[in-house]
Amino acid sequence: PPKWEKQEPNNCGPTSLAMYLRYYGWEGDQATIASLIKPKEEDRNVNVEELDYYVRNRVGWLNFQYRVGGDIEILKKFLAAGLPVMIEESFNMDQSYWPNDDRWAAHYQLLTGYDDAREIFTGQDSFVGPDQKIPYDKLDEYWQSFNRVYIVVYPLDKEETVKSIMGPHWDKDYNRQHALLAAESDIQANPENPYAWFNLGTNLVYFDRYLEAADAYDKAIEIGLPQRFLRYQFGPFMAYFHSGQLDNLFALTDYALERTKNSEEALLWRGWANYRQGKLNEAIADFQQALQENPNYSDAQYALNFVYGNP
């Protein structure tokens, strides 16, 4: 395994990616990565697309692929081929930050090995420590809340290996359709599982099926999601915006900002809701604040350019 690194606050994404890249001889650390995609320490979320952006723009000799709807078998196949794999999952914090805090958060985990006889993965956990032993069933339970996303970073000469392991999942549309069906079967297994409904919504958003996605998200919210969930996943903002459900969008972005006042994604989508209602000054203020929270947030820069270009 690569040399383990202890994460700074809210920095599991850059730290896990740094350990991953060091596996291939890269010479940087979490600060190198965070300086581009998370310039402010208070930024509590780094999403998969931001990690992808870093590798593609700063580490051109490695490639980055991510897919959803994964399973234990595909993780093992990558590891057996000598390729570590990174996932995003649930995490239980050991302290509360407000009254009745459910202490739920998101976390990245870098998997570097497995033992089939004992049914455990080995993970390099930037918060807990190196060489953590994680039972297969526990991993799947924690992984489900993030649509079972998996990330593979690899040298360009390993592309054929990665393609053969992914098989039809190399095609992103096929992969999403598979994840959509997996979410539906999770719902059948337990109709009261909010993550299954949320994943269904997210996979529907991928196919621009916004009205159906909004219904699935409604169900997830009605059953009950963790308090910080919208700090990390933004599909509902898109579904409500594109299906014209602005009241829901305002309610949800306000709730997200109550929990995470510097969430650039919630600010962005509240800005778009304001724009759709013709409140240009409020929209511009939201977009500017989003950019202030993350000066490298290109979606907010795009939004400002769009509004200034279409007053």
Show where each model-derived region lies.
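Active-site-adjacent substructure of cysteine-protease-like catalytic cores
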Residues: G69-Q124
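Alpha-helical adaptor scaffolds
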Residues: T202-L211, D218-A273
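Cysteine-nucleophile protease catalytic domains, especially the papain-like/related folds used
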Residues: P1-I74, A80-A81, F146-D173, E192-N193, ...
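Noncatalytic regulatory segments and standalone regulatory/sensor domains
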Residues: W98, D102-R103, T112-F207, E212, ...
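Terminal, low-structured helical/coil segments at or just beyond the last alpha-helical repeat
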Residues: I284-P311
